[in-house]
């Protein structure tokens, strides 16, 4: 009887020991992975949504655009290699929080709500939200969008602005071009997207037009994880230097055909 009790105790001890060893190895693996991410000082990870021409879009399988070249300049000034993670726009801030990316450079407008969850750089572009309608539409301003069906890109300030319109039925899409395709197909009454992408994409839809008066005005900035002031300061320094030495104006000329920021 005593022998059986001893064996049971030994088995229990062995089980507990094996369990503790397994837990220790799991914790070690997690710490090693976290350490490898935090110590990977040669890489700067940019998160973006490459459906936002001319700021970020794909050309020959590569993500290119105004924001990409801005991020490349920041990485170069820091002595790092830029790595780009293309993801859904509404997944960018969660990716910052989890440490999947170092910064979100995606034509992201600064809002009080976003500032609760992220740290922003100095603004680098003045933008606005534009209303797009069919050329034969009688809609001429934001007030005539009341009780209309409006297509937007999910998680954007255009999405937020449209949602505030009285009685509006907002239809969300993963990318701005999808919203315009829905409008061109006659499935919605209007679309609301940012001004620069609107001008780029509407040129491919002969049946659509942009209403002159903007729905709202805003500023684009780079988003960082809360508390990452060091990286934000690096970005601010690069942006300021680019504006001072003409590189910023050269980017505007390359992607917008003018060396001046376009007025909202």
Where are these regions (language model features)?
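A ligand-binding cleft/hinge motif common to bilobed small-molecule-binding domains
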Residues: 94, 108-116, 161, 184, ...
């Amino acid at each position: 009887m005593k022998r059986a009790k001893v064996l049971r105790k030994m088995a229990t001890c062995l089980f507990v020991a094996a369990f503790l060893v397994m837990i220790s190895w799991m914790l070690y693996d997690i710490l090693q992975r976290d350490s490898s991410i935090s110590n990977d000082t040669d890489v700067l990870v940019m998160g973006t949504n490459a459906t936002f021409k001319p700021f970020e879009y794909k050309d020959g399988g590569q993500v290119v655009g105004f924001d990409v070249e801005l991020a490349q300049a920041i990485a170069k000034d820091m002595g790092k290699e830029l790595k780009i993670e293309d993801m859904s726009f509404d997944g960018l801030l969660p990716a910052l929080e989890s440490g999947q990316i170092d910064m979100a450079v995606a034509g992201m407008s600064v809002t009080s709500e976003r500032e609760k969850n992220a740290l922003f750089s100095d603004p680098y572009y003045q933008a606005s939200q534009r209303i797009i309608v069919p050329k034969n539409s009688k809609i001429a301003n934001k007030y005539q969008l009341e009780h209309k069906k409006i297509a937007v890109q999910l998680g954007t300030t255009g999405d937020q602005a449209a949602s505030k319109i009285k009685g509006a039925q907002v239809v969300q899409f993963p990318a701005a071009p999808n919203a315009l395709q829905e409008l061109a197909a006659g499935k919605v009454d209007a679309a609301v997207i940012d001004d620069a992408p609107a001008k780029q994409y509407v040129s491919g839809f002969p049946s659509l037009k942009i209403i002159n008066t903007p729905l709202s005005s805003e500023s684009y900035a780079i988003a960082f994880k809360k508390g990452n002031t060091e990286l934000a300061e690096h970005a601010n320094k690069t942006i300021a230097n680019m504006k001072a030495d003409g590189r910023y104006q050269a980017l505007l000329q390359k992607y917008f055909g003018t060396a001046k920021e376009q007025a909202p």
